[in-house]
């Protein structure tokens, strides 16, 4: 597909606004929002001042940085399980590794965090049967949702380019299971002309719906999942969620451009003379024809002045720099810190990459902050990944005739483990609480082992039956061992 394409814009006002705003967020992610910043500066300070500032530079993008910072759920492979068929779960996990699904999932999380939605298609090559997880940004998607589950599509349209009559054209690929008895997949051009047979050589409607996208009972399903940045989305699309972060990114970029302008034009003291001229200067004409005195020199030069009129008092003086760069930089960095907090990141979650305690530039998550973010985001993405696991098992069954369960899969994400020091500190604190009677034994075991209280209770019951349960808690030194 050509790389220099322009995405079609939906004809409706709401659809057009959604796509245009989503594309702004994507330009921020890809570092191609220079023109957006130029327009913002002109609208904010006027064309004359904007021209005086010069071309703005993209020195920071908090929206992109925050989206990438919190996308830590797929730093390691997730565990796939099934209560009734562990072997099937292992096969799904193995297929994901072959597909390199984790890297696609992580990229999808970045898109989801920044644009609030992302499309993930489980594509099965009709010729080879190979599976691939396609990632599609929401500016290329439209669809209709299940009324009872507003975040789950029953019809999805993807804008993409196909070769038709030896040239690339924009088409809409429509997948629909609104009517389970009459599902269809169609390729339509801009005039709604059906190009399915020209592109694929056949139609996919009703009984011709691809068998690989049918469940064991014959019901069709969409090989798509739309991830959302919230656990219970109220609609299929929510493009303006966290608009404050996008606006703040524009504001701090404008502030950065102004600081750069002041650094270049107003960071030095202003020296003035009256009725004096540097000795040895040469008279020249300026661009407007007025006379000017020119003298070659630098900061190490010692200048001598001579009066122009012996009858008039000669004077020289100096004004301070016109811009207080330290104050400007302090306000700029504090605003960056507020943007991070508006994303839900507390100061305890962050580790600074500079020795200046006031600075909020180049923040990254601490180990505890990473675990906290993983725990907060897991309930949001788990339903989507469990749905993807079920789709994967279903497609595998159609391909190899297997009988794997086609629902009921469970996803557990691999949280960042505690460091040795963190584990020892946790054990000391937990045992101290247990010795004081502030927490029961199952809670203490759950905290130390990193499991649930129910699982810890089962372990304690098993230890009691085996007669290996200690009658008193170990000391902190014993726990460290």
Q: PLM ranges: what are they?
A:
Residues 436-446:
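Short, charged amphipathic recognition helices of the HTH superfamily
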Residues 204-365, 414, 418:
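Extended, charged amphipathic alpha-helical segments
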Residues 102-116, 120-121, 259, 263-264, ...:
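C-terminal amphipathic alpha-helical
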Residues 447-475:
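Long, highly charged low-complexity segments enriched in Glu/Asp and Lys/Arg with interspersed Ser/Thr
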Residues 268-271, 278, 370-386, 392, ...:
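Long, compositionally biased
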Residues 112-114, 119-238:
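Extended, regular secondary-structure scaffolds
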Residues 1-155, 163, 475-481:
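Extended, helix-rich architectural segments
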């Amino acid at each position: 597909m050509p790389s220099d394409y322009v995405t079609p814009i939906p004809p409706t006002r709401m659809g057009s606004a959604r796509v245009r705003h989503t594309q702004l967020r994507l330009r921020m992610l890809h570092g191609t929002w220079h023109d957006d910043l130029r327009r913002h500066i002109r609208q904010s300070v006027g064309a004359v001042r904007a021209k005086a500032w010069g071309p703005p530079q993209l020195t920071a993008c908090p929206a992109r940085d925050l989206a990438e910072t919190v996308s830590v759920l797929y730093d390691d492979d997730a565990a796939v399980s099934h209560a009734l068929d562990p072997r099937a779960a292992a096969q799904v996990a193995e297929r994901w590794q072959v597909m390199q699904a984790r890297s696609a999932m992580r990229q999808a999380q970045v898109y989801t965090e920044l644009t609030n939605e992302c499309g993930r298609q489980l594509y099965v090559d009709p010729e080879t049967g190979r599976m691939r997880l396609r990632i599609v940004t929401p500016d290329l998607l439209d669809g209709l949702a299940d009324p009872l589950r507003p975040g789950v599509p029953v019809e999805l349209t993807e804008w993409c380019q196909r070769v038709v009559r030896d040239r690339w054209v924009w088409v809409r690929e429509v997948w629909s299971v609104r009517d389970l008895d009459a599902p269809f997949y169609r390729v339509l051009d801009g005039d709604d002309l059906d190009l399915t047979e020209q592109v694929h050589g056949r139609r996919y409607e009703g009984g011709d719906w691809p068998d690989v996208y049918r469940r064991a009972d014959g019901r069709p399903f969409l090989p798509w999942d739309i991830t959302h940045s919230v656990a219970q989305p109220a609609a299929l699309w929510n493009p303006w969620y966290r608009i404050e972060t996008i606006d703040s990114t524009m504001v701090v970029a404008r502030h950065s451009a102004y600081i750069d302008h002041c650094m270049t034009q107003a960071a030095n003291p202003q020296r003035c003379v009256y009725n004096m001229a540097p000795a040895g200067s040469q008279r020249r004409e300026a661009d407007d024809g007025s006379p000017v005195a020119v003298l070659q020199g630098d900061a190490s030069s010692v200048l001598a002045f001579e009066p122009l009129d012996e009858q008039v008092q000669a004077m020289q003086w100096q004004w301070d720099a016109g811009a207080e760069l330290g104050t400007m930089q302090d306000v700029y960095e504090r605003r960056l810190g507020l943007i991070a907090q508006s994303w839900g990141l507390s100061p305890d979650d962050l580790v600074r990459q500079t020795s200046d305690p006031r600075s909020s530039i180049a923040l990254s998550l601490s180990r505890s902050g990473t675990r906290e973010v993983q725990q907060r985001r897991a309930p949001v993405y788990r339903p989507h990944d469990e749905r993807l696991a079920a789709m994967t098992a279903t497609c595998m069954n159609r391909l190899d005739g297997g009988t794997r369960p086609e629902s009921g899969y469970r996803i557990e994400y691999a949280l960042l483990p505690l460091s040795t020091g963190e584990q020892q500190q946790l054990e000391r604190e937990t045992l101290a609480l247990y010795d004081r009677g502030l927490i029961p034994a199952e809670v203490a075991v759950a905290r130390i082992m990193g499991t649930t209280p129910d699982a810890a209770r089962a372990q304690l019951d098993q230890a009691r039956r085996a007669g290996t349960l200690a009658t008193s808690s170990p000391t902190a030194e014993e726990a460290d061992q």
